[in-house]
Amino acid sequence: MARITVEDCLEQIPNRFQLVLAATYRARMLSQGHTPRIETKNKPGVTALREIAEGKVGLEMLKKVPG
């Protein structure tokens, strides 16, 4: 299993603070039942970071505040 590093994600979202917010929002969406955009069996937090690193999710997460 390949490890996800912050550097992988920073290539997609250069600002660390925005990266944390986007990953948190996406992880919350995944834990509420949204479909992952990648094949994975990881927990929501890791899945969110993988989606960001692969460019499947980006700063648009900051415009979608989970409810």
Curated annotation (Swiss-Prot):
GO molecular function: DNA binding; DNA-directed RNA polymerase activity
SMART domains in alphabetical order: RNA_pol_Rpb6 (SM01409)
GO biological process: DNA-templated transcription
Catalyzed chemical reaction(s): RNA(n) + a ribonucleoside 5'-triphosphate = RNA(n+1) + diphosphate
An annotated GO cellular component: DNA-directed RNA polymerase complex
TM annotation in the entry: none
InterPro entries attached to this UniProt entry: DNA-dir_RNA_pol_omega, Pol_omega/Rpo6/RPB6, RPB6/omega-like_sf
Annotated Pfam families: RNA_pol_Rpb6
Complex formation: The RNAP catalytic core consists of 2 alpha, 1 beta, 1 beta' and 1 omega subunit. When a sigma factor is associated with the core the holoenzyme is formed, which can initiate transcription.
Role: Promotes RNA polymerase assembly. Latches the N- and C-terminal regions of the beta' subunit thereby facilitating its interaction with the beta and alpha subunits.
Family membership noted in the UniProt record: Belongs to the RNA polymerase subunit omega family.
The name this protein goes by in its record: DNA-directed RNA polymerase subunit omega
Lineage, opening ranks: Bacteria, Pseudomonadati, Pseudomonadota, Betaproteobacteria, Burkholderiales
Gene behind this protein: rpoZ
